[in-house]
Amino acid sequence: MSDQNLSRYDLRGVSASKSEVHDAIKDMDKGLYPQAFCKVLPDLVGGDPEYCNIMHADTAGTKTSLAYIYWRETNDLSVWAGIVQDSIVMNVDDMACVGCIDDIIISSTVGRNKSVIPGAIISEVIQAAGTFIQKMAEHNVNLYLSGGETADVGDIVRTIDVGITAFGRIPRSQVIRNEIKSGDVIVGLASYGQATYESEYNGGMGSNGLTSARHDILSKVYRAKYPESYNPKTPEHLIYSGSRELTEIIDVTDDIRLSAGKLILSPTPVSYTHLTLPTKA
């Protein structure tokens, strides 16, 4: 495909359609319920024909690169707690789509470039996982951290990658099979605002499309300052081609003002209904 036919997203080395991935898995077994949002397996761990297993893996994606430059600009380590929430919620939200919403075991996989990611960040990431799990327990969502792997892989990771693998076991009768039919009502929940468990306003960006978000929003001043934060094969005109600076204050509402960096880095919200009902307009 010629460059003229490629989108800005494609030219940045990512794919919105994931067509290559879909092609690679097209002949694989789809599990018990082929239309379900996640693959649902028989109860391999318990052997109960009335139960099933769900295992899921995801990461915070390139949002970690954004957190990296925000941390470099502000020295604010707390931004990494949001990244940990992103990596966990990207899993549990997907699992919720098939009905698995409690008693989930998680394991973390962190790959870092030790040259630019110090031990203080690793400590923040590990501690933040425990803090988020405790917060969810207070809202009757039970997550259990089984451990994980932290690897120094500077030859393949430019900054840091934070991923989670999650496992759940539920009755088959609880599975949402995604058998949508005429007459069904689909309710959408806004990702922005402030949920019952959140301490501040959430910009609603989540963890999808961050490659475009950070490059289209943020100023070219970060291009020269942090070459480790982007793919060096990206066309120069698509690297940090926006106008905003990370610490630039944005007037969200009459009484909410947050930096552009904080808005984009707002952690992915948990989409369980009893947690997402807003406490504030």
Regions found by a protein language model. Give the residues of each.
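A short, hydrophobic C-terminal helix/tail in secreted or cell-surface proteins
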Residues: 276-281
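Helix-biased detector of long, well-ordered alpha-helical tracts
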Residues: 1-275
